[in-house]
Amino acid sequence: MIFISAGHNNKGIKTDSGAVGNGHTEANLTVEFRNLVIAQLKAKRVPYVSDNDDERLAEYLERIKTGNASVVLEFHFDASDKPTATGATSLIGSDADRLDKAFAKELVDATAFRLGIRNRGVISEAQSHRGRLALMRENGIVCLLELCFISNIRDLT
């Protein structure tokens, strides 16, 4: 089963828009992108479970039942004080196995190529600014994809 979610979906008790840049919020862009991916999955009749726009990440993680054959994917947009910062990055758990690493690499390679931006590669959650990500505790292949930099207008176009 594929589990797909939009980071900072702007809902819940504490609204977190995520990164902001170039007139966009991360929350809105991740929902928009997630919905595009869902449309593709539906068209190909691929089964999936998605987060709801009215639930926080903790509620979503409580609701889903991942297993070893699961793929868990969450979309985000990166940001920087430097408007020239560019690229796509995949994040994996600190205890990631070879399947997590291979999936994350394929995903970031394809994303960077398709968008024509820098490939920033695969990093562990420990290398992220948060250090530890709740999503990474799920079973199966788990990846958080930073699609591009919301702060770089070229990345967004």
Language-model segments: residues:
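Active-site histidine-acidic residue metal-binding/catalytic motifs
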Residues: 1-61, 154
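Active-site-adjacent mobile loop/cap segments within catalytic or ligand-binding domains
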Residues: 3-5, 9, 14, 67, ...
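A short, glycine/acidic-enriched catalytic loop
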Residues: 11-25, 79-110, 114
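Polar, enzyme-active/binding microenvironments
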Residues: 40-43, 72, 76, 88, ...
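Conserved beta-strand termini and adjacent loop/short-helix elements that scaffold enzyme active sites
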Residues: 51-53, 93, 125
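Catalytic cores of processing enzymes, dominated by hydrolases/peptidases
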Residues: 60, 96-149
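Short, well-structured alpha-helical segments in soluble
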Residues: 61-67
